[in-house]
């Protein structure tokens, strides 16, 4: 982590690292925590395969997205409109719809987190968290505040997850075997995990932040790559240690007190009563970072087509946060099922946006300043697109089973 201190003594985060952390923290939000806990209980060591596949897809997707958007200096929807008329509006519609569902799940996650941390009702916890998130976008230097919040909450999340791994001492050898020889692992968990950590708004959060910081063009290619790899590595480490922490609990055969809250029950099994409070802090931190990243990225899409969003960007972000909070409080859907469902929806969105990005690399060099795109990177991206497209189609009929 590279940070500097200004004259005021306050934490200053370089925009490049801020973009990387925005992507990484959004990718390892409450959706991933919920998915990892739930599916690890169901599939055990075999779920390691899904984690590894999601990491591979993440590398292929993010390296292509950051490079194409970074070099072009255009956000995804604007670039899409130049490739195919109307494509930008279609992409924005899908991303925004997925993001709204995901953000309701994120708000639900903050409510569940404060419920475990402080004992408050999840809806009250969600309301408190929504107000705090809105407060961040009321300050004068919004993105500076966002970067600082990401650093602090990210540190809390990473530290507590590592503590879970140390406490559970997972059988790494079994997890390694499950990675290469998964048994009884269907496509839906893989799609859901990819959607919750790579798909939807998450695909573009870091790159859009990079563009807002002005780090664009071929001259900034090294910095673009460094930012992409930083975000990818942080997200991958979080995924690995979180899975290992939950697998450590599952491997011992520990009884989970509440199967509808597999993540919280795992912390309870690992640390005792205090574990629920630690889990609450982790889940709340994950929810807050995802709410912020989601709302910001959604607004960057809407600003191309909705003038009030463009002229009052921060207010638009506040409206998005408030909308998600109100919908969750009114709907009363259980946090766990909503988070898993949101991940599956985003997994269906992923192939659409990635196809446009890869088309620019393959056929529209004029949009990336004539840059000769690496064939290896393009090939990896195409392979990732084929996998996500097949998985999305294959799992369309399975989404209803999430709520059964």
Language-model segments: residues:
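Flexible loop linkers connecting adjacent transmembrane helices
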Residues: 2-3, 36-38, 63-87, 114, ...
């Amino acid at each position: 982590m590279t940070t500097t201190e200004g004259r005021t003594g306050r934490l200053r985060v370089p925009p490049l690292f801020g973009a990387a952390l925005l992507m990484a923290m959004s990718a390892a939000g409450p959706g991933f925590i919920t998915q990892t806990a739930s599916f690890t209980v169901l599939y055990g060591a075999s779920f390691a395969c899904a984690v590894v596949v999601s990491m591979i897809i993440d590398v292929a997707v993010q390296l292509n997205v950051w490079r194409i958007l970074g070099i072009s200096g255009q956000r995804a929807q604007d670039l899409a409109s130049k490739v195919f008329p109307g494509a930008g509006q279609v992409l924005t519609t899908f991303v925004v719809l997925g993001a709204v569902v995901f953000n309701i799940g994120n708000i639900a996650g903050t409510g569940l987190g404060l419920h475990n941390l402080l004992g408050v009702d999840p809806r009250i916890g969600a309301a408190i968290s929504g107000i705090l998130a809105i407060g961040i976008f009321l300050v004068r230097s919004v993105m500076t505040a966002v970067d600082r919040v990401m650093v602090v909450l990210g540190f809390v999340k990473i530290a507590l997850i590592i503590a879970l791994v140390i406490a559970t001492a997972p059988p790494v050898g079994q997890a390694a075997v499950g990675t290469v020889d998964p048994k009884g692992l269907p496509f839906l968990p893989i799609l859901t995990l990819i959607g919750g950590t790579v798909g939807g708004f998450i695909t573009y959060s870091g790159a859009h932040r990079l563009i807002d910081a002005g780090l664009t063009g071929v001259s900034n290619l090294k910095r673009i790559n460094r930012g992409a790899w930083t975000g990818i590595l942080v997200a991958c480490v979080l995924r690995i240690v979180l899975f290992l922490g939950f697998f450590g609990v599952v491997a011992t055969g520990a009884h989970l007190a509440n199967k509808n809250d597999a993540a919280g029950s795992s912390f309870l099994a690992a640390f005792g009563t205090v574990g629920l409070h630690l889990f609450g802090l982790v889940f709340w931190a994950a929810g807050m970072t995802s709410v912020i990243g989601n709302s910001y990225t959604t607004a960057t899409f809407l600003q191309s087509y909705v003038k009030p969003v463009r002229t009052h960007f921060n207010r638009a972000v506040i409206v998005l946060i408030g909308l998600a909070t109100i919908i969750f409080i009114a709907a009363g859907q259980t946090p766990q099922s909503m988070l898993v469902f949101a991940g599956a929806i985003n997994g269906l969105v992923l192939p659409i946006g990635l196809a446009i990005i890869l088309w620019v690399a393959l056929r529209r060099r004029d949009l990336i300043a004539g840059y000769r795109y690496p064939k290896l990177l393009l090939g990896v991206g195409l392979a990732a697109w084929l996998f996500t497209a097949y998985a999305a189609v294959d799992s369309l009929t399975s989404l209803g089973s999430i709520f059964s």
